Structure formats: C-alpha cells, structure tokens
Amino acid sequence: MKLKDTLNLGKTEFPMRAGLPTKEPVWQKEWEDAKLYQRRQELNQGKPHFTLHDGPPYANGNIHVGHAMNKISKDIIVRSKSMSGFYAPFIPGWDTHGLPIEQVLSKQGVKRKEMDLVEYLKLCREYALSQVDKQREDFKRLGVSGDWENPYVTLTPDYEAAQIRVFGEMANKGYIYRGAKPVYWSWSSESALAEAEIEYHDLVSTSLYYANKVKDGKGVLDTDTYIVVWTTTPFTITASRGLTVGADIDYVLVQPVGEARKFVVAAELLTSLSEKFGWADVQVLETYRGQELNHIVTEHPWDTAVEELVILGDHVTTDSGTGIVHTAPGFGEDDYNVGIANNLEVAVTVDERGIMMKNAGPEFEGQFYEKVVPTVIEKLGNLLLAQEEISHSYPFDWRTKKPIIWRAVPQWFASVSKFRQEILDEIEKVKFHSEWGKVRLYNMIRDRGDWVISRQRTWGVPLPIFYAEDGTAIMVAETIEHVAQLFEKHGSSIWWERDAKDLLPEGFTHPGSPNGEFKKETDIMDVWFDSGSSWNGVVVNRPELTYPADLYLEGSDQYRGWFNSSLITSVANHGVAPYKQILSQGFALDGKGEKMSKSLGNTIAPSDVEKQFGAEILRLWVTSVDSSNDVRISMDILSQVSETYRKIRNTLRFLIANTSDFNPAQDTVAYDELRSVDKYMTIRFNQLVKTIRDAYADFEFLTIYKALVNFINVDLSAFYLDFAKDVVYIEGAKSLERRQMQTVFYDILVKITKLLTPILPHTAEEIWSYLEFETEDFVQLSELPEVQTFANQEEILDTWAAFMDFRGQAQKALEEARNAKVIGKSLEAHLTVYPNEVVKTLLEAVNSNVAQLLIVSELTIAEEPAPEAALSFEDVAFTVERAAGEVCDRCRRIDPTTAERSYQAVICDHCASIVEENFADAVAEGFEEK
C-alpha cells in the first residue's frame, strides 16, 4: 500500500468534460420515453394553477436566437413553477396564416390565381404544418418541456371555430362595422395592413412647395393671392380636396419684390421659406390668424373642375413645410378626419397595386404612384415654388419591406373607440414587470384608431359575413355560430368549397333577400385577429389552463402586436384582460450591439450553438443577461458563458466525488453538532436558496445567475472548498470532522442541483444520476428546496462576516510575504496574529482551526504588541515567517513533528495518528515507496 492510498481522494465517474452536444439528445429521448412532462403534470394535479400562455411564433423557417431566448425563458418559468407547488402545464403554439406562406409558395412556382382555391389552401396548410414540425424539433432540442404532441395551431378546426366565436361576440355587441376609411395599404402585397404589420425605415422622398390660387377669398384675401402648400407625397395632389391651416397659427400675406403675385405662409416660417424660394426682399402686407382663413376657396393646381376649401385642423404645425398642408381625404387619417368634418370628397386615385387610376387624370393614368413626380411638376408649372429631396421615417410593409401608402378602401373594422375606456381600465389591473411597458401599451390603446380586421388575401380565416340581395351585411348570432360549427367540423376551407346558401343555417331568411339569394364575404381576417383570439382558442378551451392567463411573455414588439390584439378581443368579449401579468423582452443583438441580419452575416443560429457548445450554454446565457432590454450574443460571449458553466460543473463534480462514500441516512451530522464554519456555510447556502426561489417567483433570471455564480466562486471555491481538502482528504474516512463537512457538501449538492434544474435540466439530470440515495428517478420530478432558518443564524452570519474581513487582511499579509520571497505557497507560512480584544474575541467565537481556514501550516495568536515591521490594520497586525519543521508527505503541511516513521512514512504526528488508527495492516507491513 502506498501512503497516498490513505488519503480520501474523491472518486467519481462524473466527467469533467460535459460533451453536451452529444449527450443532450440522449437525455431528451430518455425524458420523452419516460413521459416526464406528463408525469410532472400528474404529480401537480390539484395544486394551484399557473398558466403561462405561449405567444405563437410564425411557422416559417427554423427558429432564430430570439425565438430560443423567448422559449427558454418560458421553460425556465414553467419548470420553476412546477417545482414550486404549482400545476403549470405548457401548451406551445404556432401562428400559421398570412402572407409569408403565400410568398413562399409563390417563390416555389405556385401560381395562386391559376389554380383551384381549395387546392391552393391545401398547399398552404401542408407547408405551414411542415414548418410547425420543423420548429417543434428546434424547440425540443433546446430542452423545452411542454405538451409537444398536443400544441395549438391557428389553422386547426377547433381553433378557427373559437376565433369565429370571438368575432361573433364582438359583432353581437356592435363592435364590427364596415367603412371606407384610409388604412395602411400595401401595394406590394395588395392588402390592408394593421399597425402591428408596419415598420419604419428612412426613405428619401421628393417634397414640393407649390401654390393654390385663391378663387373666393371671402372678403379676406384677393383673388390674386396664392396659398403656399408643402407635400412629401406629390401623387396625392391628384386627390387633394382642401387646404388645412392651424386655427391658432399666425399667417402672413406677403409680396416678394419683383413678383406680381401675393402669397400666404406661416409667419414663423417666412424667413426660411424666403431663402428656399429665392425671395430676396419680401413685403409683409397683412397678418391673419388661421381661423380667419377658414372656408376660403382655392383652385386646384390643374384640375379646373375641383375647388379646394381652406379648413382648420389640429394636426397642422410649423415644425416644417409652410404651415399649410393640402388635404386628400382618401390618402391620410388626419386628412380623412378633417375632410369628413368639412364634407370634402374622399377621392382615391391609386389602385390596389399602386397604379394611378383613370380619375387621377389622363396624364397620370397607368403610372406607378412613386413615378409621377415629373408629371406633377410639369402640371404645376409656375405654381411650383421649390422642390427638394428629404430623408424621413416612413412606414413599410414588415413582410415585403416595401413602402406603403394610406388609402381609403371599404374595409371591416373593429370599433376600438366604443370600448376604449374599458380596455384602459383593464390595463391598470395588469402587473407589468417593466413600468415603461404599461405606459407604452396604455398610450397605444389610448391613441390608436379603430382596428382594420379585413385582409384582401386568401390564406387565412374568412370573415363570417354574408350579404343580402340588397347589399345588407348579415352578421348575426345565428349565422356566425352556424359558421363556427361548420369550421369546427370541416375547417375553414369549407367557406370556399360551398356557396353562401349552403353555409347558412337551414331555412335562414332575410328581408333583404326576397329571392333567397345570398353572397359571402371574400376577405379574410387580419392574422393578428388569429393570434389575438388564442386566449379563447387555447386558454379558455383547454381544461388544464386557466383564464385569464397568469402570464404573457414576449418580445417588446408585441405591445403593438399580440399583447395589443389579445387585449382588445378579450375585453370586447368578456370585459377582462387575457393576462394578469406581462413580461416583455428586448431583442437579441450581435456582440457589437448591432441588429442581426442575414445580409450582414452576423446571425447566430441556435443549431450552431447546440453543435459547438450545447443547448445548456444557450440556456445559461439567457439567465446571464437582462432580457428586459436588448441583449448581446456572439460566439465569444457564449464562450465566456461556457467557462462559467465549466466552473459550475467542476465545482459540483468536486462535491459528487467527495460524497461518494457518504450515505445521508447513516452519515448525516445534525446541524447542532456541526462545526461553526459548517453551520455558517449551511446558513449562507440557505440565503442562496431564498434568493433563487424569490428570483424564480419574480422571473429575475439575472439575479439567479449572479447569486449562483457568486456563491460558487466566493463562498465555495474561494473559501469553503479551498480548505476542504485538509479535512475530507486528510481526516479519517469516518471521522466526525469529515462527516460534518460531507453533510454540508451533500446538502448543497442535492439542493443546488434542484435549483439548477429549471435552467440546466440536462446537467441537473446527469448529476442526479450519480445521487443514488435520492428517491425520485428524475430531478425534474422533485421540488425546489424549501428555505430553512436556524437558531442564532444572524449571530453566526455576523461572526463569519467579521472573520471574512479578518481573513482578507491575513491574505494581504501572506501576499506581501510571498512577494518578498519569505514564502512560496501559503502552507509554508507561520502566521503570527497581533489582535486587539475585538479580533481576539472573534477568533474564539469562530471556534475553528483558524490555521486550517487560512491554509497556513502554523498560526500563533500573540499576546505582546506587534513589532514595527508587522503589517498593521485597524484591529489587527500580522507577521509572516517560514514555518518551522519539514513537509508532511501526507497533508503537505510544514510541521515540527514531521519525521520518518517506522513504517516508511515521513509524516506529522496528526497524520500518524490517523494512519495508525485506520490502516493497521499497512503500518505493520510498512508502506511502499512513492
């Protein structure tokens, strides 16, 4: 037997290298085979419910890192709730209708207008479901637990029926109406868009300054006067029917020197406009308030059949332009509102493809709206005063990335204005984890217009509306519920397969159809109505979930998207918000803080991370960032997170190895019988348990990450485990000192594994497989550890906090001695302490082997005053010299008692007593040489 064999060196097959890319799929298959998700739900039956309702990602392509961050965050929350006494099922979902899928099929060569519509919809459905399957595997590969075999998908018959019923309730309450308001119109997708489908980009446009001649000045202006107008959308002049001024803005009547004409502009802008128009010298003839100009009549710049009325509008400012804007009610919301109030014609001169129509005039007909500027300039002639190119923020179609226009077309609307205050009142009842989120959603609802819910597309849920022979729209409870039942049985494609009369209840009559003839609506619903109905299609209809949901968690863009549409439909139907809490996340940016895009080549695919690092590293990264704001991710950042993971793993490996001979049922030492330092670590660990449990409850992942890493690095690695080897390796295998420390090791190991499970389930299960005395076969079926309190814990914490200060001072003294070449390692030191009474009392109170805690070979507490050469602090001073004696071959301490024993071992007296007591045969035979 060799002397080293008398050491209790930790033994374990738990590998240092995780091998996550290879092992994770193996674990995931084992969980699936064991039906772990279902078993967890069965365990929690009857407990308080917690419903995190999954916002559906769009089913198109593989998931990106933003999807991963969101789904991992949800998984951490659901897992932690499941392990905290809640019944917390998770039903993943997908959004499957809409233009992107139509675009994919178009790129694949499918010609929608040349094939049977039902066949086309079948292709859309098949493609959508193939993408659901693809993303399902992507999410499962992240280790996300949920009811993956029974997700919700917005194209299924049960979901579509639930959506129709949401619409029906809104129709019954009078919230659905048809109007010809201007809406965001995407010529590139030939459809109206909702606000949530708009994104803003910089656009360079031609802006024109031109003048309308006064036709009837109403006794205020002469007919040789011109009102100067500014526009950034020249094509809309073809539909201009008025000029809008600000009632309280001051305007001046001016005449430039050498110019026969007189002009009206905002007084505040005269100087800048004079420079722009080349007016070297201007005479101000008169000043008017805007309200004095009301109802003056001007000529259209070129259409002699059109008069343009001067009207008042609150939206006019003097921030730019001339303080006067032309008003085309068919091409803008503000224009429409003031135009309707003043009985102006709502003219629309651009078709659904962005092409100028016949009513724009023969010179314009057939041109694309963006290309008409030269024609407009030609038509304006000498009425054009200036033109310039400007860059401004402009709305784009979020899917096609093309600019959109405002365009008045007949559409179906949800009248948000009718129940706006109800929605605002409900927002006040919701808990927002970011106060700015509440303000943002509140202001969006407060300021938004009515919701355009119709779309001129085919791949979506049809609007369940019929038309009588006289054109009356029919959307009554009887017909809508009948459609819902048909969809429930056959799916929404039946709408396109059957004639209108076959979609109506048998025997249905209507006074507007004396001949019994009916037509059906051909528009579909906005996809935000699809996902915005999920509270009904899923949360209400799935018995395992509870409505309102406890939590909605999505990206911050969903304040204008899913948070918004869900809120509107839920309040419209039931008068309550669909969620009790909202937690929003920022966007994942690259390592430099730039937006990720394929064109820049700075994207990170979750699959690449899984191959290089493993999903665990991505999961740990999610907790390492403040996801309430935008976050950064790169392979370098993930490499740093991987190092943190390695530190966590190897710390826990040390605990596994050094409890391999510990049977908790037989070897646990009662708390009251622990050493003071062991009690301290037990209490500190329970502080960590409380911090992490509270942070899980508040969804504060970064708090968990910081607290866990700090505990492992500072409390364990830099302190407790730093001197642990002197106990667990050196002392007798069954000695009290070793069992005391193993008791703490095992307690921390088991509980920290449970605490890690929601974040690192693969690693936690791997650790759990080495804990043979734990009864649950999977750690995911266990509960998070409860927070314990202990007698005198505050007193113990105070004592050890003071000792840590003392230890820090001692380490500085040792470092100085090391720098002065007095010692090499700290075990070579003889440390002499010169304490005052406070420190002396402290060292007695810790009731421990202080030399062992400081990892020095010898420690003396001196009674005499410190010498001049001592390193002094306020309460204590230190001197360091090389310890006397020889190095013990067993414990490596320098000890005066170290000597060669009769059994061929050079060891100290302490090690000799351990060896002689525990290894009598080896002592009798003598140890082998090293």
Curated annotation (Swiss-Prot):
Q: According to its UniProt record, which reaction does this protein catalyse?
A: tRNA(Ile) + L-isoleucine + ATP = L-isoleucyl-tRNA(Ile) + AMP + diphosphate
Q: What class of enzyme is it?
A: ligase
Q: Which SUPFAM superfamilies does the record cross-reference, listed alphabetically?
A: Anticodon-binding domain of a subclass of class I aminoacyl-tRNA synthetases, Nucleotidylyl transferase, ValRS/IleRS/LeuRS editing domain
Record keywords? Aminoacyl-tRNA synthetase, ATP-binding, Cytoplasm, Ligase, Metal-binding, Nucleotide-binding, Protein biosynthesis, Zinc
- Motif 'KMSKS' region, per the record, lies over 595-599
**What is the superkingdom listed in this entry's lineage?**
Bacteria
Q: Which PROSITE patterns match?
A: AA_TRNA_LIGASE_I (PS00178)
Outline the subunit composition.
Monomer.
Q: What family does this chain come from, according to its entry?
A: Belongs to the class-I aminoacyl-tRNA synthetase family. IleS type 1 subfamily.
Q: What is this protein called?
A: Isoleucine--tRNA ligase
